[in-house]
A protein has these predicted regions:
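Catalytic glycan-binding domains that act on GlcNAc-containing polysaccharides
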Residues: 4-193
């Protein structure tokens, strides 16, 4: 009872709904120096999915479109077909916000760690921007929930990114690489603020 599940076709329908398409505010336009193909092409989807999940979870600290746009730039440089190899147990990361196979399994598993708002899509669908964004933002809310329990306080979204990127508590995992990954994200995020 009360277990909400979004399948691929429902995600498609939500993302063409007029209130979704007209969600505000849109993220700021890309202003980086890299030559990136269509970096602003996903702005409506970003704003729509931020609003959708903020409405669902009603967090004390809402997730912002600029934050998600910075995350996309740091994860895939706006390439919806990006794929990154990972440890076999985690599986490759796919799409705009680099969702791993392990994460997708968790988002689908009705007997697992999440208790509601499942995302029921196939790994190939992670290359579809709307589905990738839907899953990624849902996963960020889960990561924030885990972090909140551990810290015993309301974490910032930047703190949540450390968890999302798998950099471990206090950036201790992977040594200097963790710091480099976080600094890359923070310098990108700064441009969107």
């Amino acid at each position: 009872l009360g277990k909400d599940r979004l399948a691929g076709d429902e995600i498609d329908l939500i993302s063409i709904n007029s209130s979704f398409i007209n969600a505000q505010p849109l993220p700021l336009p890309y202003s980086g120096n890299e030559r990136i193909i269509e970096p602003n092409a996903y702005d409506i989807l970003i704003a729509g999915w931020c609003r959708y999940w903020n409405d669902i979870f009603g967090p004390d600290l809402t997730i912002e479109a600029n934050f998600i746009k910075a995350l996309i730039e740091s994860e895939s440089r706006f390439n919806p077909l990006a794929i990154a190899k990972n440890k076999k147990s985690v599986g490759p990361a796919r799409g705009l916000v680099q969702i791993t196979e392990q994460t997708l399994k968790i988002l689908k598993d009705r007997k697992g760690e999440i208790k509601d708002h499942y995302i029921d899509i196939e790994k190939e669908e992670l290359f579809i921007p709307s589905k990738n964004l839907c899953a990624a933002i849902r996963w960020l809310f889960r990561k924030r929930e885990i972090l909140q329990k551990r810290l015993q306080r309301s974490p910032t979204w930047v703190e949540t990114i450390v968890e999302y990127k798998g950099l471990g508590p206090d950036l201790k995992k992977n040594g200097h690489r963790s710091l480099k990954v976080m600094n890359d994200f923070l310098s990108i995020y700064k441009r969107y603020r």
